[in-house]
Amino acid sequence: MYSVNIEPDGSNHSPSRKRLKQILWGLMLVLSVTIYGSHAPLIYLCKVNGEIPFSSSAVVLLIELSKFVISLVFFLIQDWKSLKASVSWHLAAPYAVPAVLYGANNNLVVYIQHFMDPSSFQVLSNLKIVSTAVLYSLFLRQRLSVRRWLSVFLLLAAGVFYSYGGIQDLEKVSSDTNLYVTLPGLLLMLAYCLISGLSAVYTEMTLKTQKIPLNMQNLYLYSFGIIINLTAHLTSSKNSDFFDGFSVWVWVIILSQALNGLIMSLVMKLSNNITRLFIISFSMLANGFLSFILFQLQLTALFFLAVVLIGLAVYMYYGMK
């Protein structure tokens, strides 16, 4: 059985060393929340005349390359002696699965929005919280108590409320928003949420079952990610320059998302996908506060309701006995 603690295991260390590791772990989670929450504001800062000026496929490819390079540096520093035992196609092959699933979902996101409006997409995409928890429970054989299942559904409710109207631009409020969801759109959304949960849970399962260094596992994972995203870029990009539209803010996005990808690998190796779900939920709140501070967007009652629900979910999952 895998641990469901939010902190990594520190039982073999002295109390002071264990405490230090818990503090560092907590700071890492806060950093991850901040990076997740700042992604949308950073995208906004990149826009020129209201449009995104760069190729999204180029940015995603550079994020994968950055994660690979950082993992390679850490591997050469920390795990070089284990190279011979860690390199084989048998160990590498499982990492092709999440790379393909992530690639499929990236394309599915675009296709789904032909069958529903963006607001409905944002609200319904929160179903991946439940799909991830269900698949985590099934594939990793983690039986969640009724109390913990309730906390998962509280995260779902918080995500729905936040997506529906947690923040609001008072200058662009309109009552004429055309909300619609078609049956094909709903079915595609269910597929998207299942694939999202499956890719995350499969990655966690692979990271935990293989007895090789995490840095080597990351190299395998990001190698396939580079192949998939390079293929996507070459097939979708126009004849524009690869770095066309890049600014300082774009590079901040690339480096921060690369760092967050490495943090997520560590979270899934030492903790689990439930911790990851809490990080993503808290990042919504970080996004709301940053949007309020940077862009003077209005925090609505639904935002504060989401804050309460997430706080209650944390207490129910980790605090109640």
From Swiss-Prot:
Reactions the enzyme catalyzes: CDP-L-ribitol(in) + CDP(out) = CDP-L-ribitol(out) + CDP(in)
Intrachain S-S bonds: none
Pfam families: Nuc_sug_transp (PF04142)
Matching InterPro entries: Nuc_sug_transpt
Segments on the Cytoplasmic side according to the record's topology features: 1-22, 78-91, 141-149, 202-211, 269-321
Residues that span the membrane, as ranges: 23-43, 57-77, 92-112, 120-140, 150-170, 181-201, 212-232, 248-268
Lumenal side: 44-56, 113-119, 171-180, 233-247
Keywords: Golgi apparatus, Membrane, Sugar transport, Transmembrane, Transmembrane helix, Transport
Gene Ontology molecular-function annotations: pyrimidine nucleotide-sugar transmembrane transporter activity
Membrane-topology annotation of the record: Multi-pass membrane protein
Family per record: Belongs to the nucleotide-sugar transporter family. SLC35A subfamily.
Known role: Mediates the transport of CDP-ribitol. Does not exhibit CMP-sialic acid, UDP-galactose and UDP-N-acetylglucosamine transport activity.
Name of the protein: Probable UDP-sugar transporter protein SLC35A4
Encoding gene (name): slc35a4
